[in-house]
Regions:
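N-terminal secretory signal peptides and thylakoid transit peptides that target proteins
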Residues: 1-16
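C-terminal segment of N-terminal export signals and the immediately downstream linker at the start
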Residues: 22-60
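Short coil/turn motif common to extracellular beta-sandwich-like domains
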Residues: 70-76
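Short edge beta-strand/loop segments characteristic of extracellular beta-sandwich folds
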Residues: 76-82
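An anionic, turn-rich surface loop/hairpin at beta-sheet edges
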Residues: 95-120
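Extracellular Ig-like/FN3 beta-sandwich strand-entry sites
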Residues: 121-125
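Edge beta-strands of extracellular beta-sandwich domains
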Residues: 138-143
Length: 152
């Protein structure tokens, strides 16, 4: 069957319109968290993240991150927790220009688990924060970023 130019153009325009609609909706979804990931102070980031809830240090969050990072551009991190009813998991790096590194919304059916690679600007405390309905739980570890991987 021979395709006509008119049919080809109509099909191309239809797919282009659908693609543009999908692209615009993905941009709208990306904008709702943009304020959280803007440069700012550590204190302002924590205030925005906690939403007025008290913060409690706990040993029920396991923050697995190296104490010495030879390359601050690729620092592996894994967070797990035995706490129940966690709504959000967040990673905050105290000395980074943008302190909020990760914010993950968890479904109730999921185990609280997060694994990623962070970029650390300098030696800093790294916080893992688990938000529940009434309180936020946290744990922190200090990570030393070395220059050139020589330990200094």
């Amino acid at each position: 069957m021979k395709a006509s130019r008119r049919k080809f153009l109509i099909t191309t325009i239809a797919f282009s319109a659908a693609g543009i609609a999908l692209f615009k909706s993905s941009l709208a979804n990306a904008e709702w968290l943009s304020a959280d990931f803007e440069p700012g102070s550590f204190d302002a980031t924590m205030k925005q993240l906690l939403k007025g809830k008290p913060i409690v240090e706990t040993d029920k969050i396991d923050l697995n991150i190296p104490e010495i990072a030879e390359n601050g551009a690729l620092v592996p991190i894994t967070v797990t927790s035995s706490l129940k009813d966690i709504k959000n998991l967040a990673i905050v790096v105290e000395q980074n220009p943008i302190p909020l590194a990760i914010e993950a919304v968890l479904m109730p059916e999921l185990e609280p688990f997060l694994s990623a690679r962070l970029k650390l600007a300098s030696t800093s405390f790294v916080f893992a924060i688990a938000e529940t309905e009434k309180v936020c739980y946290s744990v922190k570890k200090k990570v030393k970023v070395t220059i050139g991987g020589c330990g200094g």
